[in-house]
Amino acid sequence: MPAAKHASLNRRTLGIGVINYAYYLAKNGVRYSDGSANGLTHRTFEALQFYLMKASANLAQEQGACPYFHETTYSQGIMPTDTYKKELDAVCDEPLHLDWDGLREQIREHGMRNSTLTALMPSETSSQISNATNGIEPPRGLISIKASKDGILKQVVPEMDRLRNQYEL
């Protein structure tokens, strides 16, 4: 455990994810398969990453960067907007909406409090507890049966009656 504690304190890694994304898309009347969700998805995840990085940079400004910040690509001024697969531009031509160059300069000057911020996982347990759809995945059905060590759980997608035809299964 000392090695894990050492890494945790020096990297200050987080794993912030997303649940209920299928509900978010259904509520906004867009779909995974026809491209109508692409712009909304771009804007949402740009904001998620930007504001998480901004908050971490603000914390670094107040409390100092994580000790291993120098080992991250962020310390070299490399941002997610520099490393994404450019082939995605053919799928979604949404421009960047936030001040990434300003954030890059803040991070160069003050660092970040956390070396990692996001982890987009299925989030099965969190979704069950919140009666939300799993992570960023479409639901398998409007109603699903899930087994756990605590028994059988019937889970219904949020607002099933109203959004029944908006969910993409």
Question: Can you describe what each PLM-predicted range is?
Answer:
Residues M1-L169:
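Long, C-terminal-biased catalytic regions of enzyme "large/alpha" subunits
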